Amino acid sequence: MFGYLQLINPTTDIYIKDYGNFSGIVAHQAYDPVRRDHMLLRSMKLHFGPNSKLLWLGDFHAITLSHANMIFGASSVGFKGVNVSTLPPDTLTTGIRPRPVVTMDFAQLKGFYSDLAQKEDYIMYFHDMVKFVSQTGGAPVSLRDVFLWISESVTGPVVIRTDCVTGCNNLWPSGSGHFYFPYERKTKFRYGTFVECGKNLTWSEGPQWDVKSYVVGFNFVTRANSLLGGGFDEVCYRLMMQAEVPRQVAEQGLTLEQAVRKLASEHHMSRPQLTSRRVPGITDQTKYEAYVVCGPFRTGQVVADSLQMAEDLAWREMLGTLKTLIHDEARQTKGCC
């Protein structure tokens, strides 16, 4: 459940106080792309299951490759793009490596994918929109044509890193059963569009505001400075399990579920859906898992010792998500938006 870090308290959290309301340049000092990528990898593995494999398209860090090997297994990972850790730094100016433009032969990618065994297990992840060409040194291929190929040929899950302002080269991916996973805010907000199967991928063109209206002012855990807290999982757990949201709900005389349904109704979101079950397994101790879907947002797969606890944790996470994303007068008065 640590992968879905959407419960962030903007009134008390030191990460937000110290970095959340500063300019993009200042906030970038606390930005950690390795932590962001680790969080995203764990989220994909958690959501798509223990048999899932990874096909990463775009630039990447050597440590991200190492994390992917640990999370998915070295035999279940493929990276196609540019390893920025091998590039020389721009020592004449800032010492920061320049962001490479990843150019990919579209014909080679299609051939590589067609040769994969167990295609349905591979998560095709677009880390950044790659510049596709028809063949090495050939004419550019539009992203629309790439999406069309995915919708016709890709049988496994697809995750696309999407920008709240530009989408993916002005294309906005969606699809049957898709959901958005917010995970990064630098000078602009980015989120992952999760699609259960490539053949379900659809998209629209031109400006879209279905996500941006929910996330203006949202602060992300990737802004956190590692010097300010303990281990990563400990910080994640603390962020997700804060007691303030349930306490506020209790003061209003509502259960967690009632509070989520009330917020969803007030903001014209689709009716929240809870899914829970007993976890199959051979261990003596019974475990239960639960998650909640509300509008375009989905919680993590919460696991607990009792069904009631699992369901409460799932409702709590969704409540934290909605209360963090939706503007209200109290938050604006405190300067959180």
From Swiss-Prot:
- Where does it localize? Virion; Host cytoplasm
Query: What GO CC annotations are associated with the protein?
Result: host cell cytoplasm; viral capsid
Origin, by domain of life? Viruses
What are the UniProt keywords, alphabetically? Capsid protein, Host cytoplasm, Virion
Its protein name is: Structural protein VP9
